Amino acid sequence: MTTPFARFDDRARRSSWLVWGTAVGVYFLALLHRASLGVAGPDAVARLDISATELGAFVMVQLGLYALMQVPAGLAIDRWGARRVLLVATLVMGSAQILFAVATSYPVALAARALLGVGDAAVFIAVLRIAAMWFPHRQYALLTMATSLVGAAGNLAATVPLVVVLDEFGWTRTFAITGATSLVYGLLLLRPAVSAPFRETAPSASEETGTEPSEGDPPARPAPRKPSVRETVANVPASWRRPETRLGFWTHQATMVTGVVVSLVWGFPYLTEGLGYSSAAAASQLSVYVVALLVFSLFIGPLAGRKPTWRTPMGLLAALACAGAIATLALWPGGRPPGSVVTAVFVIIAMGGPASQIGFHLARDYNPAVRISTATGLVNAGGFTGAMVTAIVVGVVLDISSGGTAATLTDYRWALGAMALLAVGSTVAMFGSLLGVRTLVLERMARGERVIVRVTEHWWDRLYRRVRPPGR
């Protein structure tokens, strides 16, 4: 006999939106945990008696392991599925936050942030995997945007609300509560869902070459069996060989690094120690960043989905704007920009978060479904590798400039200058990769092949071919 509860459970198990909603809840928690050190940085310095370099090392280790685990996480999702990986990730993140709550020494706290980076690594690409497998292709841009919005909400919760909770309950109880929340939420992931309606298939000839399918292409073959470990590992070089995957890697790095480094670790100390803001005012400024990120997500995500030809120009514009905004803070006469300028800079760098999603569109469109998670992991690694390097460089520059004493505004200007230079370097790499991809697309079009996104030849394409001829 079928009970009403059983019928409800069956409908719920078949709901694509319920599956995505459960998964994106993990992403909300992941962003809350990831950004929690942003406003707790000064408290960490006082509690653990650490320097600016050691504070930067928290982010370096957390983001470094996050970046390092991107490819293994993608392989695990391709091999065992998103639900199992999300369950493990949720439990690991919760345990890491509880360990961070009780840490009273720097090594223990560092180990906790490292564990958090490992748990966090798989969450976003698992949610994107669910979006790709549970929804039709036309809804992918919408789901990517919605995922970013939920993540931004988690980031927002790690600003003013977290400051209030820290002031009210203190370090230990605050981080213990957030960790316990993740552990309890993991219970929702114990029940497996039915098979995804848009399951992965083996790649067709057109998927392997990055062209649109032609009438003579055989249809993609169903791949009901789980890929072997060898086949899964082989996805890594196969994904990286795609020039569009490499373009996604650099796009993600060039657009997102400044926002991540500012929001996760160095924005709050710059505002409080460098510009003399109160903790509440600095947290409010970070909230402006998150709100701007939410607003930009409403526009950039849909545009990237509906206007494929606009994707890389939008990404390049966002990367240049972010680098220029950070340079403005570093080079402002006297070093103390007015509040309106600081707010404008935080709004501009928020553009990079939604723009970084363009890298995932490239991974999604130019890799067969059996490699989506691996390619997405490679793209995601680009941004967080850059963020790791930038965070530690800022800390080192601060320590060198300040001589180990309390950092001044001048010290922060040097550090921001270093951040701007690194952002420019990533943008140059993105532009070079973009020119290479455009050259390949123009060659395919000249041969009469159909391509996923058509391009129009410009003078810079001809100049690039002269400087770096095809085949080199």
For every predicted segment, state its role.
Residues 2-12, 196-249, 448-468:
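Juxtamembrane intracellular "pre-TM" segments in multi-pass secondary transporters
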Residues 37-38, 242-297, 390-391, 395:
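Extracytoplasmic gate region of multi-pass secondary transporters
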Residues 49, 81, 102-108, 119, ...:
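Helix-breaking motifs and short loop linkers at transmembrane-helix boundaries and internal kinks
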Residues 68-107:
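Conserved MFS/SLC helix-loop-helix module at the cytosolic interface between two early adjacent transmembrane helices
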Residues 69-81, 296-310:
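Helix-to-loop junctions at the C-terminal end of transmembrane segments
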Residues 79-89, 305-320:
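Cytoplasmic membrane-interface "Motif A"-like loop-to-helix N-cap segments
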Residues 112-151:
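Cytoplasmic helix-loop-helix junction between adjacent transmembrane helices
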Residues 146-198:
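Helix-loop-helix hairpin linking two adjacent transmembrane segments in secondary transporters
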